[in-house]
């Protein structure tokens, strides 16, 4: 616990007490909720806290002053043990680490009791958040778990049905008992884990052990290729949002799968050393140091040293998160310094990684690309593992669909899709200056838009200065905005023959009005199982091509429909249309249409993006950047877009199935059908 704050240690000390007692004055109280932990002995700290904060005097086993108010079970306590697992106490624990805590309940709790205890645990979690400590409680029935019925719904914090034995391996290698009975598995060695249940039964029959003295989730002999597949998918899912924490576990599963079916589990190694009296092994009984050693051995055998170096960097960055809070003699700092020397890192490498929270865009992009390459390679290796073992996954199908869709939205590169950089890499990517440069007909650069993070008068345009490229201005601005380079304080410049600075500034303002720069929440599982409906849509008319700027005489008294076939030349005054939209999978996508038929192409594509019978987008914003006829064009396009959307989502129950438009001198008949406009 060295380096953890007072609040963290306070929550860790008091949480078991609050599970043991159920008193109206105490945090976590729920009327009639089961309470009481087997073999519970209150510490001096806990007793003092009760006395000082609530004037309650606690006496072990017989809390006489609480008897009338506490639902206290002396004979059959509902809680057999409380264990914290994961990074707790390891080199990877930081101030932001949560406390994943298993509450092992006795067999036979009624559904109502289970519900009340769940509510009590939730209230204790809420109490802990007052100290900025996140503690997650999981009620675990050992018999239910042993029968592989641990299949709660998949969430960002819960693997659902994706892993069972692997979760138990992690629990056994990292669990620390806070209160209650000890774990039988840690005290009983068998040569083959498949024989564990038989050995336990034999010892019970011969009277050598009393099962009531222990908590037992069973042995580790039921691994399957299917479970490796499901668990690896889930950790890849976690790795998208929390790469530094997940990289090591992803590689551990890959190393385990290579050894399958004769996997050498870390939990088994720990138990062997404990029972052999080896109190000072290389892993120091630190689960994360042991994982690092296992992964290092695996990658070294494959001669994948670049991949190993990336793992080292992720491990260092994750462990380094809180080093500024530690004293110089902290064991975590000393150990990481030893590792950096063993890895042969230069002082410059260490300095660069220490500055990771303050990296700017080029370093962040490089790191983000490395993370994506790593995850993609792990995904390909996982697919190969599935083929090798002919996996027809027994993971709940809904889980697999959710996991696959999450990976799909993160990995797939599509034209117009805005790549969102991982927000954990750096604390602040904002730029003081951004310049957008349009290039056409240059033999050294492909046509499109280039972004430079310097003011225009400092630019010597070169590939080395470019931080991002986009085929359209819309996509490039969206990339800068949603990745937080472009803020309200950013000074903008533009180098273009077609777009003025004032137009760019108005476009950025409208984009900011239409979308928050930060996506506040993860998509719901139900959303990931459905089609990628458009949630918010922003449409820009004539952003990069404005035919009205070349009109010498403004005509009056014309029909709005004439704007698509204007004057004697019958020219469409819509030269370009840009879409920016966020879908229910929380992807940001852009589309660009240009030319005399831009309006037709845009409507056709939009009708295919709005699926029949889905919800109407939460918002549709239309802006026009024309020099002339700005309001007329905006109203005309907005009307067509709203009609198209209304027909597709079913707001118009009996729509006119056709619509006639004259565009650039040609008459077009639009047919609204199930598959969109044709």
Report the location of each language-model feature.
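Nucleotidyltransferase catalytic cores
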Residues: 1-56, 147-155, 172-678
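Extended, Lys/Arg-enriched charged tracts that mediate electrostatic binding to polyanionic substrates
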Residues: 41-78
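Short linear interaction motifs
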Residues: 60-67, 76-85, 291-299
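Catalytic micro-motifs at enzyme active sites that drive phosphoryl/nucleotidyl and oxygen chemistry
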Residues: 68-73, 81-93, 124-127
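Catalytic metal-binding acidic patch
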Residues: 83, 90-116, 134-138
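E2/UBC-UEV (E2-variant) core
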Residues: 116, 120-134
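Short, conserved secondary-structure transition motifs
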Residues: 133-155
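Acidic, Ser/Thr-rich peripheral helices and adjacent loops at domain boundaries
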Residues: 155-164
């Amino acid at each position: 616990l060295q380096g953890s704050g007072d609040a963290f240690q306070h929550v860790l000390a008091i949480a078991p007490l609050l599970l043991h007692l159920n008193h109206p004055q105490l945090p976590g109280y729920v009327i009639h909720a089961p309470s009481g932990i087997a073999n519970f002995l209150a510490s001096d700290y806990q007793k003092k806290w009760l006395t000082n904060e609530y004037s309650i005097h606690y006496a072990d086993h017989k809390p006489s002053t609480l008897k009338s108010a506490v639902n206290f079970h002396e004979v059959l306590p509902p809680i057999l043990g409380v264990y914290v697992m994961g990074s707790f106490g390891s080199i990877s624990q930081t101030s932001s680490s949560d406390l994943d805590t298993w509450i092992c309940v006795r067999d036979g709790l009624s559904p109502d009791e289970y519900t009340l205890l769940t509510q009590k645990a939730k209230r204790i979690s809420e109490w802990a958040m007052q100290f900025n400590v996140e503690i997650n409680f999981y009620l675990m029935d050992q018999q239910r778990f042993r029968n592989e019925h641990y299949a709660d719904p998949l969430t960002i914090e819960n693997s659902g049905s994706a892993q069972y034995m692997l979760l138990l391996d992690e629990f056994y290698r990292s669990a620390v008992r806070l209160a209650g009975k000890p774990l039988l598995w840690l005290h009983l060695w068998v040569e083959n884990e498949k024989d564990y249940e038989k050995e336990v039964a034999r010892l019970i029959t011969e009277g050598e052990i009393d099962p009531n003295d222990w908590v037992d989730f069973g042995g580790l002999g039921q691994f399957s290729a299917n479970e490796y597949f499901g668990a690896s998918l889930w950790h890849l899912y976690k790795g998208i949002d929390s790469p530094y924490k997940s990289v090591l576990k992803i590689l551990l599963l890959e190393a385990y799968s290579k050894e399958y079916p004769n996997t050498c589990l870390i939990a088994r190694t720990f138990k062997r050393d404990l029972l052999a009296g080896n109190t000072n092994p290389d892993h120091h009984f630190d689960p994360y140091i042991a994982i690092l050693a296992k992964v290092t051995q695996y990658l070294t055998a494959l001669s994948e040293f670049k991949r190993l170096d990336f793992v080292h960097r992720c491990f260092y960055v994750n462990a380094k998160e809180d080093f500024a809070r530690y004293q110089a003699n902290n064991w975590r700092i000393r150990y990481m310094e030893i590792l950096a020397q063993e890895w042969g890192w230069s002082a410059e490498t260490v300095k660069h990684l220490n500055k990771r929270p303050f990296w700017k865009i080029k370093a962040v992009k490089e790191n983000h690309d490395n993370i994506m390459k790593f995850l993609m390679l792990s995904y390909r290796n996982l697919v190969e593992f599935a083929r090798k073992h002919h996996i027809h996954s027994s993971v709940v199908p809904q889980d697999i669909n959710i996991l696959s869709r999450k990976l799909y939205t993160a990995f797939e590169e599509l034209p117009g899709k805005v790549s969102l950089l991982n927000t954990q890499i750096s604390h602040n990517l904002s730029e003081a200056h951004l310049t957008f440069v349009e290039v056409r007909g240059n033999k050294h650069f492909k046509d499109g838009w280039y972004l430079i993070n310097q003011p225009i008068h400092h630019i010597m345009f070169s590939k080395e200065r470019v931080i991002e490229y986009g085929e359209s201005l819309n996509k490039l601005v969206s990339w800068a905005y949603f990745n937080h380079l472009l803020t309200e304080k950013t000074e903008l410049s533009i180098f273009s023959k077609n777009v003025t600075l004032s137009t760019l500034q108005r476009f950025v303002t409208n984009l900011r009005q239409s979308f928050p720069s930060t996506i506040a929440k993860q998509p719901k599982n139900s959303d990931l199982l459905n089609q990628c409906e458009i949630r918010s849509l922003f449409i820009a008319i004539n952003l990069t091509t404005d035919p009205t700027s070349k009109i010498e005489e403004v005509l009056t008294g014309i029909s709005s429909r004439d704007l698509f076939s204007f004057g004697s030349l019958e020219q469409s005054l819509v030269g370009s249309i840009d879409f920016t939209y966020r879908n229910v999978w929380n992807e940001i996508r852009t589309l660009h249409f240009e030319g005399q038929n831009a309006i037709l192409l845009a409507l056709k594509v939009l009708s295919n993006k709005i699926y029949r019978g889905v919800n109407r987008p939460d918002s549709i914003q239309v802006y026009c950047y024309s020099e002339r006829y700005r309001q007329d064009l905006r109203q005309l396009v907005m009307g067509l877009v709203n009609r198209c959307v209304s027909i597709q989502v079913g707001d118009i129950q009996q729509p006119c199935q056709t619509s006639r438009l004259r565009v650039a001198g040609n008459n077009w008949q639009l047919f609204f059908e199930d598959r969109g406009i044709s």
